[in-house]
Amino acid sequence: MINYDLNKIKAIIFDIDGVLSCSTINLSEAGLPLRTVNIKDGYAIQLAMKLGLRIAILSGAKVESVRVRYEGLGVEDIYLGCAVKISTYDEFLAIYGYTDEEIMYMGDDIPDMEIMRRVGCPVCPKDACAEVKAISIYVSDIEGGRGCGRDVIEQVLRAQGKWVMNEKAFGW
């Protein structure tokens, strides 16, 4: 269980590689990266948005397939190719007027740490690097790309009394 007042959470920001996709990347014959994503993460993401949580994607990756996947789920805040993530995070806060305490961030590696040190609720997948685990309030029992996003979304929605309590839960 996440040791944080999850009723404070208004937005969840996810990294992609190692969080919503596993830590390996297959390459196409043309050398393009192919990522695998978890369908349960996808269901939880679209449900969370229907129930009032803002979901954002913040990644160093520049792959258009990532944008297509998450736009297809209804995610509006997709930030790709972020070399330094903290400046994009600050822009996100300014756009919506959020405070750090209202944000959950799920990351898995060194580039995520600057944001994770600021947010109210830093979380990570089971296979995150040791440095990220050390600063996380919660380490999921699930590895990146295997449903760790669903894990944290479900905990937030349950804490807020919204998990499967609504007709919106029964459809995409």
What does each of the following model-derived ranges do?
Residues 1-5, 162-165:
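N-terminal charge/polar-biased segments
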Residues 31-34, 73, 77, 86-172:
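Mg2+-dependent phosphoryl-transfer enzymes with acidic/Ser/Thr/Gly-rich catalytic loops
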Residues 2-84:
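Alpha-helical substrate-recognition element adjacent to the catalytic core
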